[in-house]
Structures are given as structure tokens and as C-alpha cells.
Amino acid sequence: KQQIDPQGTTQFLPMGAPSLMDIQQTDYNAKLVPGSAVGVAITYGDFAVGATGTVTAVDGKNILAFGHPFLHRGNVNYFMTDAKVVGTISGQSNGMKIANIGNIIGRISQDRATGIAGTLGTFPSVVPVKVRVQDNSLGRTDTYGARIAYDEDFLAQLSGGIAYAALSK
């Protein structure tokens, strides 16, 4: 069982429950260049909430991306992930990329009007959530896990949302 410190947080440990092993990866040596796809997530695991965008600039391990805010929350503590573009949608005024978040590669620490910024190879403080769903009518039990990037304003909503999503599966 994972220990949580007195403030209710734990540092991200790149290990997962068996149900997460195929999707939960950490890449300590990730490299991004301007134009690369990048993701930002506030939850990661069996349930993920986040967005993807484009890297604007790289200075060593520091990156600037999106060119617009994610949630416009200032100082933040989110997962940075790599991302894979799987399709595009064209439009007359603007187009969109369809992408998936991938491996955890760092921490997003700024979410400002001009974009998001973060550091490769550092990781956010997180709150681990594990939900066990027992369906007596089907005679089966499933366990789901996720990590929520520590943010007091989102913690209750996201943990409740993860529990609800687990019940809905």
C-alpha cells in the first residue's frame, strides 16, 4: 500500500497496478523539439483527463507549448506527456489535431495566457486513487487506478469522477 504524507500528497512513482502496466510508462530521457506533439494531464492511469498541443520552444529541459492556456491557472502541478497525433480535422477558420497522450515525461508548472511551460524529467506531486468495483450479478471484481496531479481545487471533483467512471465501466 502506498503511503501518503501528512499533506495528502505523494511524489509520483513510475509504477502501476497490473491493469496500468501497458499504458502507464515514464520516459526519463524524452526529448522534445519545437513542433513536437506534447500532452498535459491532470489525471493519468486507467482514467485520464488532459489535452494535447504543440511544443513552441525548448531550452534544455524546459519547454513552452500550446501558445494558449490549458486551464489558465497560473502556477500548476500537472503531468507532461508525450503525445501522438492520430488524425486531423480541417476547418475554414482553424483546424484541429486528434491526438493521444502517451508516456509521462515531465511536469507542467505554468499554465498562462501565452501557453504552458514545464520541465522534462521532473514529476508532479500526486494523489493515487484506486477503485475496486464488485459486481455480484456478474460475479466479478475489477480494480482501476489513476493518479491525480495534486491540486486542491480539482481533487474532490476528479476523485469522484474517477469513482463514477469506474462504476460506469
PLM segments and residue spans:
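Terminal presequence/propeptide segments associated with secretion/organelle targeting
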Residues: 1-169
